[in-house]
């Protein structure tokens, strides 16, 4: 799967690191083997119920993130890309995403109130919607240069880490709620950011994208309402929306400048 939006962290730190690592992989090992290995590791932790150990879950999320990036880079660098590889990669993203969400949810279940549980479930469905959209277009268009999927996974690693170091429930709740706010705003940005691209899509693609956007926006508005009702934090939304509008206008201006340069 190709990625449309990479972050500064990925481009400047992670990508060079992965390229060095893939050079040491024997060419008799295929990218699909790495993808399947990734699935088996996560599935093994899930079946054995070792995810109740915060350290095991933290390492599992790290391994998933590492191998998920590595198999794609290795496939491109070794020129072993294939349709089967894309299908396996897409399937892994959704299936492993479901497993990781479930394992995190079960690990923190005793410390989450009803509002937070609902918000996390809504964020999860929003992520699945974006993954399905990405499968249709054969690329990930999620995030921007300051925050992408890699940063989101790094944040998720810290959730079981807090549990492992036996921090107080209050601190765990503060971090989890903060993570909820970040993911909600991140998802709203992705929804709004894709709106200007609708006019460039072909006729068959528009119903899929419009349905995705409407569903996503509804999910995120409900999430933000629940969070605002719980913490009375409606006022940051206005500041955030201004920031989102600025990002979209700036991105559109850059695209227009690039078109002028090309012409």
Name each model feature, range by range.
Residues 7, 34, 60-61, 89:
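Alpha-helical transmembrane segments of multi-pass integral membrane proteins
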Residues 35-84, 99-104, 116-127, 180-183:
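Membrane-embedded alpha-helical segments that form the functional core of polytopic membrane enzymes
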Residues 1-22, 137-263:
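C-terminal membrane-associated helical module and adjoining short loops/tails
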Residues 71, 75, 79-92, 141-147:
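Juxtamembrane helix-capping/reentrant segments at transmembrane boundaries
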Residues 27-36:
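Membrane-interface helix starts
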Residues 131-135:
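Transmembrane-helix bundle segments that line or gate the permeation/cavity pathway
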Residues 46-57, 100-120, 160-176, 224-234:
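Helix-coil boundary and interhelical linker segments in multi-pass alpha-helical membrane proteins
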Residues 85-101, 148-155:
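Alpha-helical transmembrane segments that form the membrane-embedded catalytic/substrate-binding core
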């Amino acid at each position: 799967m190709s990625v449309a939006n990479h972050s500064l962290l990925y481009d400047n730190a992670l990508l060079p690191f992965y390229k060095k690592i893939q050079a040491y992989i024997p060419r008799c090992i295929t990218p699909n083997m790495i993808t399947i290995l990734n699935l088996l590791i996560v599935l093994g932790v899930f079946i054995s119920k070792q995810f109740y150990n915060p350290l095991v879950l933290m390492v599992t999320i790290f391994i998933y993130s590492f191998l998920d990036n590595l198999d794609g880079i290795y496939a491109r660098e070794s020129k072993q890309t294939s349709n089967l590889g894309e299908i396996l990669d897409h399937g892994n993203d959704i299936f492993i995403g479901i497993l990781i969400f479930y394992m995190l949810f079960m690990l923190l279940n005793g410390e989450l109130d009803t509002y937070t549980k609902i918000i996390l479930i809504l964020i999860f469905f929003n992520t699945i919607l974006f993954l399905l959209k990405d499968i249709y277009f054969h690329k990930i268009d999620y995030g921007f240069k300051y925050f992408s999927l890699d940063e989101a996974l790094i944040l998720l690693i810290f959730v079981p880490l807090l549990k492992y170091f036996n921090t107080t429930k209050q601190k765990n709740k503060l971090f989890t709620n903060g993570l909820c706010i970040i993911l909600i705003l991140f998802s709203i940005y992705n929804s709004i950011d894709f709106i200007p691209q609708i006019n460039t899509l072909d006729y068959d693609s528009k119903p899929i994208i419009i349905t995705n956007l409407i569903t996503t926006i509804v999910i995120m508005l409900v999430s933000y309402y629940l969070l605002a009702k719980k913490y009375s934090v409606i006022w940051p939304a206005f500041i955030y929306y201004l920031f989102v509008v600025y990002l979209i206008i700036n991105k559109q201006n850059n695209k227009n400048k690039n078109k002028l340069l090309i012409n």
